[in-house]
């Protein structure tokens, strides 16, 4: 395993660890999810370029689309929770049910 792959895996692991440790605030969780998506995007791009698999060249773009959708939904949820309750605790998400 090359040093680049190892660094990307470490970045993904640190983001996952941050998501597990700082899950009380919604903003921290969203930042850790974005770090994980960025690591997956870079890893998939490098792997596709290294194996010269041109048919799979759309996979990183699709991953970026899903990451953008996840970020938009997460930020809108963050705005809704912070406007309603004044704080961005994840435990307040249970109170938003109809």
Curated annotation (Swiss-Prot):
One of its GO terms (cellular component) is respiratory chain complex I. It is a multi-pass membrane protein. One of its GO terms (molecular function) is NADH dehydrogenase (ubiquinone) activity. InterPro entries: NADH_UbQ_OxRdtase_chain4L/K, NUOK/Mnh_C1-like. Keywords: Electron transport, Membrane, Mitochondrion, Mitochondrion inner membrane, NAD, Respiratory chain, Translocase, Transmembrane, Transmembrane helix, Transport, Ubiquinone. Its EC number is 7.1.1.2. It catalyses: a ubiquinone + NADH + 5 H(+)(in) = a ubiquinol + NAD(+) + 4 H(+)(out). It is an enzyme of class 7 (translocase). GO terms for biological process: ATP synthesis coupled electron transport. The chain crosses the membrane at residues 1-21, 25-45, 67-87. Pfam families: Oxidored_q2. It is found in: Mitochondrion inner membrane. Belongs to the complex I subunit 4L family. Core subunit of respiratory chain NADH dehydrogenase (Complex I) which is composed of 45 different subunits. Core subunit of the mitochondrial membrane respiratory chain NADH dehydrogenase (Complex I) which catalyzes electron transfer from NADH through the respiratory chain, using ubiquinone as an electron acceptor. Part of the enzyme membrane arm which is embedded in the lipid bilayer and involved in proton translocation. This is NADH-ubiquinone oxidoreductase chain 4L. It comes from Talpa europaea (European mole).
